[in-house]
Amino acid sequence: MATSVLDSENCRISCQPYSKWRDKLLPIIQKTAENNRHPFAENVDRALLDSKAFLFLSEDGFVALKPFDGDKVCVLFAYSFTQGATMKYQPEIEALSRKIGAKSIVFHTALEGAFIELCKRLGYRKTSQQEHISTWVKEIG
């Protein structure tokens, strides 16, 4: 399997086979879902196993991206072992999304407070709210 790599001044992420990393990453995904009262772990796991989403690793975290509807990318999950994952990975997520012709990036979150303010500064807008889960979209092209 060919490995796709994006380089920037701040981050280097590479596409990796989920099956190779599942035993290490799935517990992180599950714990995060539990902590946020947002039952997304099974959907993330299944999308990665079925190759409907793609796993990108960096030295300090990972992100799962799922193309959909021909011109959109959903950030199914993003995690960093250090602070600042959103700021750090946003340029790479946008570059990968543009590379496949995406016009927008979507994510769902239970996070609030400072994270929401950061999302607004990065150009995302809230498009819906169901219970404590909000959906955010950023137009990129």
Model-flagged regions — what are they?
Residues L57-G61, G101-A102, H132:
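Short glycine/proline-enriched coil/turn segments at helix->beta-strand junctions
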Residues D50-A85:
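Conserved donor-binding loop and adjoining core beta-sheet/short helix segment
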Residues A53, R121-K126:
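Short glycine-aromatic motifs
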Residues D71-L122:
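Acyl-donor binding region in acyl/amide transferases
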Residues M1-P39:
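Short amphipathic alpha-helix that is part of the acyltransferase structural core
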Residues V63-L65, I105, W136:
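Hydrophobic beta-strand residues in large extracellular and virion-surface proteins
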Residues A33-F54:
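Active-site rim helix/loop that mediates acceptor-substrate recognition in acyltransferases
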Residues R125-V137:
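Conserved catalytic-core motifs of GNAT/GCN5-like acyltransferases
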